[in-house]
């Protein structure tokens, strides 16, 4: 496998590669203007067209640093960044509230983030509330009919990927030759938490998709719908996926999209073989006690 030029830290470049030339208007989504350059500088939000279709763009800026929060740099999604991204999603929902399902604008997420910014101040104020707000916003947009496509161009790691990517209808990723990484946490952190030596985990990472960091392993789990082989391939892949997602929503096939759809895809690819059994067991066990939790009438 020949290594290609990395896109890590190049979220802004990726935007220009994907959208119609010169169409990206940063800081404006619908009627919402993001006028404060010091609020969430690591989050890039705006409006562009993609083959003439208006879409919302949300990305992390690998070259920005939030001076109010020292741990927020190099694409990390911090407290302010999470809220800023959520605001962009809600502005999109509001702008298209009266439009039919076929005209809801797509949301394109450019993913390159090494994680969240869990500094002391962020934890005190509620970093989890910020990332949860962004996740909820994307889930609401998805269920209201907006096609949401995540394009992994570099790092998709930990809780930052949980909020900036995993709520999408479909996830695409540049293939492994671009150095893309998708995983929960570095093996060094896993080693400390589960008390296994690093050497053992490195062996496991070559055998198990759960421990591995590359996009191909995540693809086998169904977490990535498709791998993109070239930089020029990002734009047509996103355009095609938007059309597929929109068609599925118009046909009422929501369960084929988003987290639930990726679960089924992983099962079909043989990467999540225990999933059906666990779901069946949980459904059976809950049915046995469901009456206790039924709402009072």
What are these regions (language model features)?
Residues 53-61, 65-72, 80-118:
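A structural preference for short, pocket-lining loop segments at secondary-structure junctions
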Residues 34-35, 45-47, 94-99, 138-139, ...:
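A generic local secondary-structure boundary/capping motif
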Residues 52-54, 102-106, 144-148, 167-168:
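Short coil/turn connectors at secondary-structure junctions
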Residues 1-22, 26-38, 44-56, 60-83:
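Conserved CoA-thioester-binding segment of acyl-CoA-metabolizing enzymes
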